[in-house]
Amino acid sequence: MHARAGIIATSLVGLVALAGALAGCSGDANAAGGQDKTELVFATPPGTDDPNEQAIFKDLATMVGEASGRTVSNLQPADYLGVVEAVRNGSVDVAVLSQFSAALAYKTDSVDPLLVWGASTEPASFCLARKDSGIQSAADVKGKQVAFIDPGSTTGYFMPKSMFTKAGLVDGTDYKSTFAGSHDSAVLAMANGNVDVACTARQLYPTFIQKGVIKEDDVTIIAKSDPIPVGISIVVRKDLDNEAREALKAKLPAMLAGNAEIAKTLGISGEPVKDPEFSTYAPLVDVAESIGVDLDDLR
């Protein structure tokens, strides 16, 4: 589930500046502290410029408002870890977090997870190459350049990089990598020959074909990652009032499940776990460690 086309890859150093900008947008969010607020600021991860996807996120924000009984404004920070920082510093009250962003946020005590859905059985990521490149499998990536999405992206970084690691390939030694900043940008860079391979979310692949971003006859799916061991999370700032928390837990799951487009976009099915323990996210920590990433280092 993801920065917009054309955005240059955001370094982790830039998170502080992003957090400051968000704080300015949210007015006195920090001053409100644990006090009840009549308006909630809701954030979603970066996605694509697809108007349909943007409309789905607006519908999601509306549901958060209906479930909580509050007025809701919506933000979409430019990178995945920016969402974590915005919740941590009080600029955002409620957010959807991708799997590794949620694990990071929980591990660093930055947010309170309210809801987390179960794992999918589908591959998380597809890695693509031009058909005329001669790249047919993960093993062929040796000596090539790969476009990942963002340091906090589950489908655009952690899962595909883990796949290459399992294939015996070490980033920086066996292949070079770059962060494209968005799924669109990574796929376009591959299609235009600027990189050899682009790794993106499985569910975005048919969208890119339908929208004409790439032609199916021109690309090869060279590898598919494992499924993500944990689903998407809804999190809140740590001092959000109990009334809003309980209302969201009670009402939001059924509302999301009842909207087929939202459920598909977020990859949710079944009943979520409410107030999950950190052990729920432990499989994600294992994946991060397998590729040499300590989630604490991403703060």
Model regions: which residues?
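Bacterial N-terminal signal peptides that target proteins for export
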Residues: 1-12
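C-terminal motif of bacterial Sec signal peptides marking the signal peptidase cleavage site
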Residues: 20-24
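Bacterial signal peptide processing site
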Residues: 26-29
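An extracytoplasmic/periplasmic, membrane-proximal ligand-sensing/linker region
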Residues: 36-43, 48-65, 229-230, 235-236, ...
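Bilobed "Venus flytrap"/periplasmic-binding protein-like clamshell domains
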Residues: 37, 42-63, 77, 100, ...
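A local structural motif
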Residues: 66-75, 91, 166-180, 215-218, ...
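Short, Asp-centered acidic motifs that coordinate Mg2+ and/or phosphate
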Residues: 93-94, 113, 196-197
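Short beta-strand->loop
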Residues: 111-120, 175-176, 209-227
